[in-house]
Structures are given as C-alpha cells and as structure tokens.
Amino acid sequence: MNSKTFYPTLIFSFLILLGFCFGGCAATRKEIYIPLNPEVDRLPIYRKFSVQAALLISEEDKKYVYKGTPSGSLLTNLVHVFPLGDALENGSLQMFSQIFRNIQVVRTPAEAKKFKIVIAPQIEDFNFRYDEAGDYYLRMGDSRYIVPTAAVKVKITIYSEGTAVWEKGVKSPEEKKPVPYNPGFANAKEIGEVVCQALDYALKRMAEEIAQDPEVEKNAASLSIDGLAKTFAQHRVDYQPGLPGTGERL
C-alpha cells in the first residue's frame, strides 16, 4: 500500500475508533438489534421423499439470541443482538421442505414421535466482525467502506425410530459484503444479510447430501420416532462485556 492510500486508511480507522470511544465513555455500551430474514437458495433436486418430517427445535433453541461484540478491531464497543434461533428455524423450514413432502415444527421429542423422520438442527458456532475495505473501495470518491463478515457452523441430526441415521456439521466460509460506512452505525441490514448468507450455505450443503443419502431414503418409510428423551438445547458461551466475539442466551 503506498502513502496515498495508507494515510487515508489510517485516518479512517482512527476516526471510527475515536468516535465510538467517546460515545462509549458518555453512555453505556450501545446495543443494536440485527434483523435476520433468511431466504434460502433453491436446491437442484427433482424429487422429494414421500414422507412428512418433523423439524425438532426446542422452545429454548427457538428463542436463542446471540448477544456479543465483533471480533477484530472495528466497532468492538457495539453489542450486536442476533436472533439466531428464529433464523435457524425459518431457514431450515425453507430448505428441508424442498426434499420432504411436508415439514412440521415440533418442540419436544414427545411431539416428534408421530413422525417417521425427525430433523434436529443446531447452531454450533458463530462469529462475526468488520474488516477495513481494500484499496479499490477506499479510492471510490469520498465514501469510506467497511466489510461486514460472518461465518456460522450448523449441525443436523436425522432420527428414524429413535436412532440417528445421519449426522453432520458444516461451517460456512466467511461471507463478506463491502458497504459504505455510516457514522453512528446504520449497517444492521447488511450484517444481517451476511449472516443469512452464511446460514444458507451451511443448510444447503447438508440438504443436498441428505437428499442423496441412501440411509435416509431407506428410513424415510420407517414407523415412528422413539427414545428422543434428551434436550436439544446446546451449550452457549456466556457473554462477557469487553470480550469480543462472545455471546449469551437471552
């Protein structure tokens, strides 16, 4: 990077940090709610399993909200609130309705017993941050750009007659979207879109495998789901003020 681009970049980063530092000193840490509205891709699938499946997401997991600060060095005094549980349910419904005849959400293993196939999704890992944009964006007029970045890991377990017949976790690559930086932070929509893209990637990779898995196909006509006595609420990392990238269950 030559001096023509280095100094504007340095000044831009300093102004972001300085502005939010003064804001943080004058008041409590600011919380921002990030809307998540997943719209999943269509799968290249031309047939569905002719069975109704249950999507098992406990009430606790449905209400799971990740609350934490970004990793990295930008905007680290902003506490972000992500409704990840709701996004996981909505994204899973859209994705798995493409490979099963019908999908119905259930909250408990007892409800799941009525179904031949049970799909149990969980979010295992999530991280996000803001990066500085490259030289190309820094040269675009007077605008300054930041890059919302996010990745998510999702695990899917499929049960038939109380037995796990398929299980896998997939972590998305880091999804990114350069956007103009707005003082005071007006980029909630953009970071939400990046998170939804990461969630879509993970769900799509697993749905494609499930649709072609012979064991799932063989068990699609099995009788009922038994023995799911365990809770599917996963452990969360406690949010600690001042530590980037941590989250809490609200």
Give the location of each predicted region.
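Bacterial N-terminal signal peptides that target proteins for export
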Residues: 1-12
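Bacterial N-terminal signal peptides
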Residues: 11-21
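A structural "domain/chain start" motif
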Residues: 24-94, 208-250
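Surface-exposed short loop/turn segments
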Residues: 26-34, 106-165, 244-249
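Generic short beta-strand segments
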Residues: 57-63, 122-132, 171-177
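Short secondary-structure boundary motifs at beta->alpha junctions and helix caps
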Residues: 70-83, 147, 159-212
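A structural motif corresponding to the C-terminal end of an alpha-helix
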Residues: 89-105, 161
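Surface-exposed patches in mature extracellular/periplasmic domains of secreted proteins
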Residues: 102-111, 217-222
